[in-house]
Amino acid sequence: MSNQVFTTLRAATLAVILGMAGGLAVSPAQAYPVFAQQNYANPREANGRIVCANCHLAQKAVEIEVPQAVLPDTVFEAVIELPYDKQVKQVLANGKKGDLNVGMVLILPEGFELAPPDRVPAEIKEKVGNLYYQPYSPEQKNILVVGPVPGKKYSEMVVPILSPDPAKNKNVSYLKYPIYFGGNRGRGQVYPDGKKSNNTIYNASAAGKIVAITALSEKKGGFEVSIEKANGEVVVDKIPAGPDLIVKEGQTVQADQPLTNNPNVGGFGQAETEIVLQNPARIQGLLVFFSFVLLTQVLLVLKKKQFEKVQLAEMNF
């Protein structure tokens, strides 16, 4: 089985498991990590943009916090925050309203990877909870993804990470490395094939007069908006269940004028930070140096006191 097929099957299986665990029906618009894994060999483009932004068009703030420096072969935590108003509801694939789901991709330096369960301290395990992080692909263990998961529970995530050991991995050095992170809340507006989801604005395809607005399905919802152009031709714009119409019959519209509101309440954001893989020998050398400086200072103080005593004795004599 090729790596691409393996990745697709594994990602799809994970999406189903996570959806069941979160009590969510995993629709294509929700399973955004699967889209990225299926369509992009690398989630970060050459211009620095993370590919999730291709489908999640709105921007929202995200935050990531990691230690300033770590020692080799050490487990540390990255804290991810996807802040949003927990009271808002998003449009689901069936047009109904529901809670937002969240997901993220974390691009670590080469050599860094998800910490094995037996290496993760109990304190960090408790913070991680039931989240299951997976590598982006079998060859890219330094890139981690998770989602969709319930936003109310996981708007803050803790990722246990194992730092590499340059003594064992010759491709790693004691340097400062960048870490890239992208996170989103809510469903996307565009599918990878370019088609719109029902979580976005729908615009008029032509200028003219709205001559009819017809319900597509009483059960599933949605509308057909018929627009008569100046030459008498009638074009029909189909609007799925989800967005609310903001036009009415008899109204004149321009091409690309919004026919609906913007139902999207989520958004995507990305951030980056840095981490230093610290050489233990440097720390030991620094401690020795500080100890030497401290000892020198103590000896100088003692020598000064001894000199003062000698001076005092000579004056008394």
Swiss-Prot record:
Alphabetical list of SUPFAM superfamilies matching this protein:
Cytochrome f subunit of the cytochrome b6f complex, transmembrane anchor, Cytochrome f, large domain, Rudiment single hybrid motif
Cofactor annotation remark: Binds 1 heme group covalently.
Tell me the first and last residues of the signal peptide.
1-31
Q: Which cofactor is essential here?
A: heme
Which residues bind heme per the record? Y32, C52, C55, H56
| Residues that span the membrane, as ranges | 283-302
How would you describe this protein's topology in the membrane? Single-pass membrane protein
In terms of Pfam families, this protein maps to:
Apocytochr_F_C (PF01333), Apocytochr_F_N (PF16639)
Looking up InterPro entries in the UniProt record yields: Cyt-f_TM, Cyt_f, Cyt_f_lg_dom, Cyt_f_lg_dom_sf, Rudment_hybrid_motif
Q: Which GO terms describe its cellular component?
A: chloroplast thylakoid membrane
* One Gene Ontology term from the biological process aspect of the record: photosynthesis
Molecular function per GO: electron transfer activity; heme binding; iron ion binding
Q: Which family does it belong to?
A: Belongs to the cytochrome f family.
- Subunit details for this protein? The 4 large subunits of the cytochrome b6-f complex are cytochrome b6, subunit IV (17 kDa polypeptide, petD), cytochrome f and the Rieske protein, while the 4 small subunits are PetG, PetL, PetM and PetN. The complex functions as a dimer.
Q: Could you identify this protein by its name?
A: Cytochrome f
Source organism per entry reads Chlamydomonas reinhardtii
Q: Which gene encodes it?
A: petA
